[in-house]
Amino acid sequence: MLACGGTNLKANQTQIASESVWNDGASGGATGGGISSFFALPVWQKGLSALTTQGATFALGMRGVPDVSGDADPETGYDVRVDGTDTVIGGTSAVAPLWAALVMLVCALPGL
């Protein structure tokens, strides 16, 4: 299982200016993260820490989510064509297939 979160990505053709958590209360879209109450700490997160809302650091004891993120803000999302009409989409429903395709490409590399 791969938990996908969302970001707001400010970029041009050559560089990323900023990337932050996607949280657009005005349009009702948002993503978040935290520490799972159900899933054990995976080996790849051992030794990592997180911040409390007050800024204090603590060691992860359970799985931190999301595992990965991608541009999910519809304002900065993906240009697509639907029924002949160009539009921009976003949301973690756009991020999840993006990561699925990336994982598939990595798994298809020789020697894996």
Question: Where do the PLM segments sit?
Answer:
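Extracellular protease catalytic domains of secreted zymogens
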Residues: 1-112
